[in-house]
Amino acid sequence: MARILITSAIPYINGIKHLGNLVGSQLPADLYARYMRGRGHEVMFICATDEHGTPAELAAAKAGKPVEDYCAEMHEVQKEIAAGFRLSFDHFGRSSSARNHRLTQHFAGALAENGFIEEVVERQFFSVADNRFLPDRYIEGTCPNCGYDKARGDQCENCTKQLDPTDLIDPRSAISGSTELELRETKHLYLRQRALKDEIEAWIDSKTDWPVLTTSIAKKWLHDGEGLQDRGITRDLKWGVPVRKGSEPWPGMEGKVFYVWFDAPIEYIAGTAEWADANGKADADWERWWRTDRGAEDVRYVQFMGKDNVPFHTLSFPATIMGSREPWKLVDYIKSFNYLNYDGGQFSTSQGRGVFMDQALSILPADYWRWWLLSHAPENSDSEFTWENFQSSVNKDLADVLGNLVSRVTKFCRSKFGETVPAGGSPGEREHQLVAELQQQLAAYETCMEAMEVRKAAAELRALWVAGNEYLQSAAPWTVVKTDPEQAQAMIRLALNLIRLYAVISRPFIPDAAASMMASLGCEDWSWPADVGRALEVLPPGHGFTTPEVLFRKITDEERAEWQTRFSGVRT
């Protein structure tokens, strides 16, 4: 049994996330976690809300609430929606937790002690209209690289280029919109990433199995232009982790907080500590996942994120870990994703464009969305959500292929043999061929899941469903029963066991439907089918079942048209 540590990029607290956020991190991470648990491995799956920095302050101000209250409220909202999508986190934490405060301050102290922190006096925009310094994300303007007119002072979300506020063309305050900005002096802490560049580059070079998307972004940031730059890790904000050198005050840093991108990844570790606290466990129970001197040397750590998060996870967070000179676990594999676009435009939380997670759940159950998003995951290039494609995929894959098989088999058995697994007959050549075919296809499915090739895994799973349908079509038990009822019983006995097999292997993608299939079969045996032949004998003759309700209903043309109009691209 392996030990798998899984973290998903933690979502900002500033509102409900859209489907592009979901498919770019949390959902594929959940798929992998569920699969690994299903194979019998020990899994720790951690996520949290990212509650500090400019997004939180701006969103709270817009909502007219104190930032602490806003974050507490939105954490519960995001936690509830995550549960609605059946995201199986072992813990869903908060970056504003006391654990993360202490751990962030600890890392800063360790970095300073090892000479990787520099105090820098810099010139920063001060808004006369707002009477305050403006951290990078409080400034908007036009990106000098791609011309996007809503770029932020730290990064352009359109082209992902890292920016300095002074790089922006026509900068303005994100608070008031005022262009009356002055450059004034202020002192900040910088993480000396350049001093760690050789270590980071050697570490990245050692990860020969990483996706091209991950390594290409990391190396671009390492080498493009002037190469890897030192990174400011403090901000002139009120809300955040107060700057301290470990447990001690940091002279000259009074009233400042750590930059959100410094403390947010540390929440992966802190969130695991929160898990221990919430479950009455000792520190040793979370440290065995994170400290290589306390049991984490055999852990495989996998991160999931959108491509815009890759630079921070391949450069800045590893620099924090390496520079601490402490035995913390570094990530083994980073699964990154391109963007999911929406009907000809971009999904965007800040711009309110696209279908958001709460809206999605209000019109269809989670499995419909999970299946479409994962089977169209933007792995090798950007992908696009369209209502026509969504309707087609749901109707063909879920309703026609899987749902239809479950319905036909259970209803036919009930009408001809009753609601028990029939005992007659024995498998023939056709059944043996099916078992061999399924064994081969299952191996292909497992290979894709192990490699986190999400779209390919979905295609292999669908192929497994199709194989069952093709068997039923060729075997035609509804015809055979007229001349050889014993043989028809053998076919249906296999088909009922096939439903259980599908429930087990489909669970990572469509957990609710899998649970419904198992419940209708009166079965609680979720063991992974190492041997397909044996797996198709788990339900013995005489075992009772119930005929389930429709597993997946079809989306009508009228519904599709209505939703397309209702979700025309802007959330109001």
Swiss-Prot record:
Keyword Protein biosynthesis found: yes
Keyword Phosphoprotein included in the entry's annotation: no
Residues that, per the record, bind ATP: 349
Name of one Pfam family that matches: Anticodon_3
Motif ('HIGH' region): 11-21
CDD domains per record: Anticodon_Ia_Met (cd07957), MetRS_core (cd00814)
Protein's UniProt name: Methionine--tRNA ligase
Source organism: Cereibacter sphaeroides (strain KD131 / KCTC 12085) (Rhodobacter sphaeroides)
Gene name linked to the record: metG
